[in-house]
Amino acid sequence: QEAFDEEKASELQEGYEQFKENHPMPYAELLFSDVPDILEFLRQKEVKIALASSSSMFDIKQMLDIHQLNSYFEVVVSGNDFKQTKPNPEIYQSTMKKLGVTPSETLIIEDSEKGIQAGEAAGATVWAIEDKRFGMNQEKADLKVDSLTAIQKLLTESSLKMIKA
């Protein structure tokens, strides 16, 4: 069995980048349609917003550019920036530190089981958006909702007291 070396790693990375170029991610199909509305709502309420994703920064930036969402986020963090990604809480701990907020001031919106576990381990409140397309286990979330619009309604009713920094 051949040892994994730098040359092989570089070759695989090059192949992966070529594949991604030839098969772009269908961001329009994956992004929840109510994302722009809730981001605008949060901006008007002067809520600090961050994006902490396990995806590569390349993929994150591509999605943000395609949907013109860059201006909403004070902090954007990629899982590539950490030795371990979700469910390890480091991505959320680092993001909260960069935003200058504590776990008790933070609401994490997640859809994945590992993301929910990471948010919980970071000490933050975690709400899950039910996404029936992928069948994620979301039972550990503090609250499950069916859309970002539902989250906006809940935040309006609570006057954002629990997440406003």
Task: Give residue spans per PLM region.
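Short, acidic loop-to-helix structural element flanking the phosphoryl-transfer center
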Residues: 22-51, 57, 61
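Short amphipathic alpha-helical segments, especially helix-boundary/capping motifs
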Residues: 11-16, 35-37, 50, 68-72, ...
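Metal-dependent phosphoesterase signature
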Residues: 1-37
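N-terminal-biased segments
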Residues: 1, 49, 64-66
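Short, mixed-charge, low-aromatic patches
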Residues: 14-20, 48-54, 106-113
